[in-house]
Amino acid sequence: MKDQYKVLYDPIKIGKLEIKNRYVLAPMGPGGMCNADGSFNKRGIEFYVERAKGGTGLIMTGVTMVENNIEKCALPSMPCPTINPLNFITTGNEMTERVHAYGAKIFLQLSAGFGRVSIPSIVGKVAVAPSKIPHRFLPGVTCRELTTEEVKEYVKAFGESAEIAKKAGFDGVEIHAVHEGYLLDQFAISFFNHRTDEYGGSLENRLRFACEVVQEIKKRCGQDFPVSLRYSIKSFIKDWCKGGLPDEEFEEKGRDIPEGIEAAKILVAAGYDALNGDVGSYDSWYWSHPPMYQKKGLYLPYNEILKKVVDVPIITAGRMEDPELSSDAILSGKTDMIALGRPLLADAEIPNKIFEDKYDKVRPCLSCQEGCMGRLQNFATVSCAVNPACGREKEYGLKKAEQIKKVLIVGGGVAGMEAARVAAIRGHKVTLIEKNGYLGGNIVPGGVPDFKDDDRALVKWYEGILKDLGVEIKLNVAASKENIKEFGADEVLLATGSSPRTLTIEGADKVYSAEDVLMERKNVGEKVIIIGGGLVGCETALWLKQQGKEVTIVEMQNDILQVGGPLCHANHDMLIDLIKFNKIDVKASSYISKKTDEGFVLNTNGEESIINADSAVVAIGYLSEKDLYSEVRFDIPNARLIGDANKVQNIMYAIWSAYEVAKNI
């Protein structure tokens, strides 16, 4: 381990509680981790214990509701201590005792709830808020204003929940949140809070709710019981449901930095022992849940400001897994602790691996949010695109095979590599053959843009892991019925992937696939048409625009990003906003019919116009490569399709399907 990284393992205190190192499991939505009575289930316990086992010093649970009457949530959705305190203490004790066995501490994150950003599938179409304001997700729905008495009930519920948490063995609590536009944050922001009672008006009044919460907890649990606060110094709200991009000039409608500084001082003076800082809101979700289009360490400039104005530890998340970045952030005084959320979904052992000088063995988070936020927004259990066992560690972990088999895998894309990894871990003798001279499949062209560097890192990780596991890899070997039969495998997995759909345009010769352009096999010129406004088309357009090209997207649907996915809201919204911000022209409900001497002919709802361009780049989806399977299916009955060869889907389902099949060989 580099000397610089040693600071990541220095102890630190939150209040009087000592944490063994600087790593924090960032609190994340606990989908699938609780019982109907608000207590923790086995999945939830195993999830948090696994991260403690991986070396994280402070475990923070996902959001836990303090009550379920004022803002009634469908159960089971989130834990809640006050529904059945006895069961909560029983299951909580099992969790905290096991977490403590690894030398970690654990905080329970307590929440007042969602308010105007309530998830309809959880709360329904009735929402509460500080004032009568529009709902974030339900057009035409106005939130009910909470009464003064209800606010005071919330404060008492926070105190009661913290007492229960302390009895369950939690070392402290985190308050959720003067952050991201949740209910407590809505009270703190004048854009949302129009009240005239003691909880509205001045900044001090708008923060009264959050201040009374920490004071109530300290009164019940003792002044030494640590309480941290999830806090956003800036909201990045342009308007209702509209966020501001990096480097974009706009009028902040939420909390801006000067008020954020004053608010932080007031909150710390009220008794908060640490600030878990970030920026953003549900109106600018791509700040709170940063996609791959955001810079790594995006919160550091803002938390550095907090560090200078308050005297409590500052915790920073935001794509911070690289030890070079995280250690420098601490040494340069920008933060005190490093919170990892999604990276610890991808690999629970990041702190241990860095300590053991094995950072190259860390499975990278892609910031795709397909397995975490993408699933939570669809009311599914939390997991990870690149780690299928995440959130179901015990029931879905890998075990040694009872019978060792000879396994042949055809294709070295992500499905093939994952199947090889899983089969080898289970003890099988694995050979992987790949027709190209490299591994990675479609992720290789997809990983070309700078903002997709973690895709490239995933391929590199697989290469290293497969080598460590002793998988025999044969590149530049095309599979055939003859050489598969000659190999004599007990199991054959065909991960032959998918190939881009093609398109012929009358009169045009410079029509290229997005793959050929990304791999720099073709020169597109200076003016480019992208045919297809799905994920590949939009990301290719953004990449070309960053090179100074003039880019037009032509899409048959009525908007871009309508087909495929589903994408997490944050990724979807940021990509659309980046397309607009970068002045990439979008022609929706349109198609290119032909090319003439004047240019490409655009047909929009029956009306024709001309687009002058040097070339057209086709990104209209992929087709499964099933030819080999069709050829061998009757002669080699133990051959099975996996990944895109079985069904074209996103990277998560390619990996998950490969894991499932290889797990059961």
From Swiss-Prot:
Keyword rRNA-binding: no
Annotated residues for binding of [4Fe-4S] cluster: 365, 368, 372, 384
Pathway the protein contributes to: Amino-acid degradation; L-phenylalanine degradation
E.C. code: 1.3.1.-
MF terms in GO: 2-enoate reductase activity; cinnamate reductase activity; FMN binding; iron-sulfur cluster binding; metal ion binding
Coiled-coil regions listed in the entry: none
List of catalytic residues: 182 (proton donor)
KW Oxidoreductase (keyword) present: yes
Enzyme class: oxidoreductase
Binding site for FMN: 109, 230, 319, 341-342
Catalytic activity, reaction form: 3-phenylpropanoate + NAD(+) = (E)-cinnamate + NADH + H(+)
Keywords: FAD, Flavoprotein, FMN, Iron, Iron-sulfur, Metal-binding, NAD, Oxidoreductase
Biological-process GO terms, alphabetical: L-phenylalanine catabolic process
InterPro entries to which the protein is assigned, alphabetical: Aldolase_TIM, FAD/NAD-bd_sf, FAD/NAD-binding_dom, NADH:flavin_oxidoreductase, OxRdtase_FMN_N
Cofactor(s), by name: FMN; FAD; [4Fe-4S] cluster
Residues the record lists as binding FAD: 415, 434, 442, 452, 479
Gene3D superfamilies xrefs: Aldolase class I, FAD/NAD(P)-binding domain, NAD(P)-binding Rossmann-like Domain
Family: In the N-terminal section; belongs to the NADH:flavin oxidoreductase/NADH oxidase family.
Protein name: Cinnamate reductase
